[in-house]
Amino acid sequence: MNVDDLTFDDKGLIPAVVQDAQSKEVVTVAYMNRESFEKTVETGETWFYSRSRQELWHKGATSGHTQKVVDIRYDCDGDALVVLVELKGPACHTGKYSCFFESVFGKKIYGASDRFGIIATLEALIAEREAEMPEGAYTTYLFEKGVDKILKKVGEEATEVVIAAKNRDAEELKWEVADLLYHLLVLLREQKLPVDEVLAVLEERHRPKEE
């Protein structure tokens, strides 16, 4: 596409919805003008236009929390963008994973959607932990130790699942499977592989074949 395919408003701006490419959660909404859009495409990192300061700003230039662009999509009218990114830290200036952490109804926000219930909740929570790295959190500990530690835990939990199943201990089995699923989700996040891509493989395998 060409920048001329986009429709900017009377102030020369277009809204950009920024989405975590892995968890698919919306992390912020900002505005771009023609120049910031072109710099985003050129550099592969997000650039926006500040309406209050009336100047371009490179996300993460000061904090280091840059956003690597994976894809940019535009709607049918060409007057709104969705920017899929890999986060290099929190998206919000408050230090939160997402700017959308308050609920009108007072609900606890993990950033999860209704795609597949608790799996989406865990995926979003793990993404939040990786971005914010809160001290004392077990998930923070795993990310700090790195892939070898995460793989070790996946192996340990898989072994526990086998033992529980071998012993025909249904109560223990469900707990061990839950632990294994959690550590697999941490591994997927570390590997930058969205759960959606795993689900797509399952869907493809079980899709009825055309005659």
Curated annotation (Swiss-Prot):
The record's GO CC annotations read: cytoplasm
Q: Does the keyword ATP-binding apply?
A: yes
According to the record, the residues making up region (Phosphoribosyl-ATP pyrophosphohydrolase) are 119-211
Q: Which reaction does it catalyse?
A: 1-(5-phospho-beta-D-ribosyl)-ATP + H2O = 1-(5-phospho-beta-D-ribosyl)-5'-AMP + diphosphate + H(+); 1-(5-phospho-beta-D-ribosyl)-5'-AMP + H2O = 1-(5-phospho-beta-D-ribosyl)-5-[(5-phospho-beta-D-ribosylamino)methylideneamino]imidazole-4-carboxamide
Q: Name one Pfam family in it.
A: PRA-CH
EC number from the UniProt entry? 3.5.4.19, 3.6.1.31
The entry's keywords: Amino-acid biosynthesis, ATP-binding, Cytoplasm, Histidine biosynthesis, Hydrolase, Multifunctional enzyme, Nucleotide-binding
Entry coiled-coil feature ranges = none
Matching InterPro entries: His_synth_HisIE (IPR023019), HisE (IPR008179), PRA-CH (IPR026660), PRib-ATP_PPHydrolase-like (IPR021130), PRib_AMP_CycHydrolase_dom (IPR002496), PRib_AMP_CycHydrolase_sf (IPR038019)
Query: Does the UniProt entry include the keyword Cell membrane?
Result: no
- Which parts of the chain span the membrane according to its record? none
- Homology family: In the N-terminal section; belongs to the PRA-CH family. In the C-terminal section; belongs to the PRA-PH family.
Q: What is the recorded name of this protein?
A: Histidine biosynthesis bifunctional protein HisIE
* UniProt source species: Halalkalibacterium halodurans (strain ATCC BAA-125 / DSM 18197 / FERM 7344 / JCM 9153 / C-125) (Bacillus halodurans)
